């Protein structure tokens, strides 16, 4: 038994809810639904990790894997054979097309300065971030 705490998230052009209160050591199951019209990401990381991940996302756009409202999954599979990052198979992240659902189970151990963010190019920059308060 994982001892999960469930959290439902809706993504449009922001996260709902826009912040979380989490106890240190708690395991959360995030059920995420993209109810918007664009591709969005739900990524749990600190700011430095988000900054490091953003060029990978830009490369997915440049290679026409990541489109405004869809993901070319066939192209993603092919590119992932050459560059693992292009497969976007990160345990802390889910990349969702419009009307798509996904989930992440995450244990918040020794986490500092964690935020949930969308690293689709331009989205983080316009404030697509949810605050995570760990106590």
Describe each model-derived feature in a short phrase.
Residues 1-11:
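Single conserved hydrophobic/aromatic residue that forms the stacking wall/gate
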Residues 14-22:
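Short beta-strand segments of immunoglobulin-like
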Residues 26-30:
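Structural beta-strand segments of beta-rich domains
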Residues 32-36:
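Asparagine-centered strand-capping/turn motif at beta-strand->loop junctions
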Residues 37-38, 73, 77-80, 86-135:
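Extracellular/periplasmic metallocenter environments
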Residues 41-45:
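Beta-strand signatures of extracellular beta-sandwich domains
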Residues 46-53, 133-135:
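Short edge-strand/loop segments of extracellular domains
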Residues 54-87:
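Aromatic- and Gly/Pro-rich amphipathic surface segment
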